[in-house]
Every structure is written in C-alpha cells, then in structure tokens.
C-alpha cells in the first residue's frame, strides 16, 4: 500500500512537470469523476422517485378500497333496514296479491327518493326468492353492469326465505373522484361482460384490446381515449401504476361475489400543470440532479 502511494505521488510529480500530460490526466480524471458521480446520483434520485410513485399508488389504492367499503356499508344498511321492516315483511309473505304489489310501490318510492338525491338512477331494490339464497356484500356483475350489491335474507315464521337486494352502480364513483380532481373508470373482463344484458352491452360498451369492456358513455371521452394507450397485457399484479404524457394511472384488480376476476378499476390524475403530482416529482428529480452536478464539478475543480 505504501509502495502504491509512493508510486502515485511520483507519477503526479512527473505529470505536473509535463503540462500537456498533466492537463490530460486532470481532464480525464474530472470527466470520470463527474460521470461516476452522476450515475450514482441519478440512481439514488430515480430510486427515490420510484418509491414516491409507489407511495402515491398505495395512497390511491387505499382510497379506492375505503370508497368500496363506504358504498358497501351504504347498500347493506339499506338492505338490512328493508329486511327488518315489518310492513314490507308482512306484505311480502302475504298471499294477498295487492300486498305484493304494495311492496313494489314502497320499494320504488324509496328508489326514487334516493336517486333524486344522487342526481341519477343508480340505485335499485329487488327481491330474490329461494331456500338457497345467501347473504352477499360486495362488487358484483349483473345484467345492468358492475354494481355494489348487498343481498340480505328476510325469513318469515315458516322459514320461507327471500333476499332483499340493493344495488348501486359502480359509476357513482365518477362524481366522487371528480371532486378530488381525479378520473375514474371501471373495465369489465371479457368473461364478466357476458353477464350484461346483450342490448345494453352492444349499445353502451366498447371493447378494449379484446380483453376488457368499458361503458364509454359514462366517462370523460379524453380519458377513455387515452386509456386505450395503456398496455393491458403488462398488468399482472393485483395493483400498480402506469405513467404516460397525460395521466398518472393507478389500477386495482376487482373480484366479484363469487371470487372471480371481474375487472380493473382505474384512478388517474391528469398531468396538466406544474402543480400536478407527476410534474412535481419530475421537477424535484431534475433540480436535485442539477444541484448535485454543480456540487460535484465544484469539488473536482477544488481538488485539482
């Protein structure tokens, strides 16, 4: 080690005596130091940026799951209230045909009141009869499309079972996310799309890469068109994020009440100005890189 230091010192002294060689070594050493330092800084900054995107993705996914819980609680509470309503139960299990009609009337009144508050027809109430019906709460695919569904049993004294079913269109999340300045879209898998009414599917849904279907009329056209550029073949994880020139997308796989893969939920933030999340990260990375480059050059010039 001592011999190497002595050799290096001698080499430097000889190089300083030869101006051309000295400046050549100085230039090469400086450039090597700059490139090595830049590579290291770029690696660290890129890693920080990636972790920032991951944290933002996790935040979006958590927000989506909380919205699902909130919607499920809403439909479940209404279904439970209806299942425990004595007037509805008496009418439903009555042999009087007028009593059964009265149920439909009451249910329709409740539907209309709630939908008038929501601003559109997104909630519906129905009844399923049978001894094998069971309670189920979550996202499901019906002939109307993807919905939040709560199916709660109502049993009479003779053991006859019916299910009070409350559904709410998943597209109600569009307005929720719009208030947060974000875009939302739900894409059905090709297999799940077979459960939708054929006329509705033909008139309202658009095929995406022959793998998914989207109710295009429900969503912002610019957002829907931009979604077509997403590589759906690369979506393998339960959730993840994708970036392009216009949006930062976060996706979450969604499963129906039978546990089957039903579709993909997308939440996206538009890259439209310097205050957008993606641009803030990009500007931060560029600023840190430039500052680091300035410090590295200054240190190298000082050392030599």
Predicted regions: what is each one?
Residues 2-7, 260-276:
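Juxtamembrane amphipathic/hinge helix adjacent to a transmembrane helix
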Residues 3-7, 13-47, 286-303:
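Extreme N-terminal signal-anchor transmembrane helix of membrane signaling/transducer proteins, especially
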Residues 19-105, 109-123:
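Juxtamembrane extracytoplasmic/periplasmic/luminal helical "stalk" adjacent to the first N-terminal
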Residues 103-118, 134-138, 155-207, 277-283:
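Solvent-exposed, extracytoplasmic
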Residues 117, 130-135, 215-240:
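Soluble sensory domains of the PAS superfamily and closely related sensory modules
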Residues 144-153, 244-253:
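A short beta-strand signature within small-molecule sensing/ligand-binding domains used
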Residues 154-164, 255-265:
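Short hydrophobic/glycine-rich mini-motifs in sensory/regulatory modules
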Residues 270-292:
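Membrane-interface helix-start motif
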């Amino acid at each position: 080690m001592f011999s190497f230091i002595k050799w290096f010192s001698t080499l430097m002294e000889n190089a300083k005596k030869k101006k051309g060689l000295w400046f050549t070594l100085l230039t090469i050493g400086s450039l090597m130091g700059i490139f090595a330092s830049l590579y290291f800084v770029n690696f660290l900054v890129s890693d920080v940026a990636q972790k920032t995107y991951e944290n933002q993705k996790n935040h979006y996914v958590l927000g989506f799951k909380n919205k699902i819980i909130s919607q499920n609680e809403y439909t479940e509470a209404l279904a439970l209230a209806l299942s425990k309503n004595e007037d509805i139960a008496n009418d439903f299990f009555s042999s009087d045909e007028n009593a059964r009609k009265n149920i439909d009337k009451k249910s329709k009144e409740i539907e209309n009141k709630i939908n008038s508050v929501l601003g559109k027809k997104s909630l519906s109430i129905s009844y399923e009869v049978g001894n094998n019906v069971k309670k189920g709460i979550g996202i499901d695919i019906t002939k109307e499309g993807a919905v939040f569904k709560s199916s709660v049993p109502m049993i009479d004294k003779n053991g006859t079972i019916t299910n009070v079913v409350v559904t709410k269109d998943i597209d109600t999340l569009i307005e929720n996310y719009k208030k947060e300045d974000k875009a939302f879209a739900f894409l059905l898998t090709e297999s799940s799309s077979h459960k939708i009414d054929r006329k509705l599917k033909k008139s309202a849904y658009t095929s995406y890469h022959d793998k998914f279907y989207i109710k295009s009329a429900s969503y912002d056209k610019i957002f829907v068109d931009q979604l077509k550029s997403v590589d759906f073949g690369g979506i393998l994880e339960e959730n993840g994020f994708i970036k392009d020139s216009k949006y930062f997308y976060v996706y979450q796989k969604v499963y129906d009440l039978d546990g089957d893969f039903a579709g993909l939920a997308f939440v996206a933030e538009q890259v439209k100005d310097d205050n957008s999340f993606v641009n803030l990260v990009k500007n931060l990375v560029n600023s840190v890189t430039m500052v680091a480059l300035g410090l590295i050059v200054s240190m190298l010039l000082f050392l030599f």
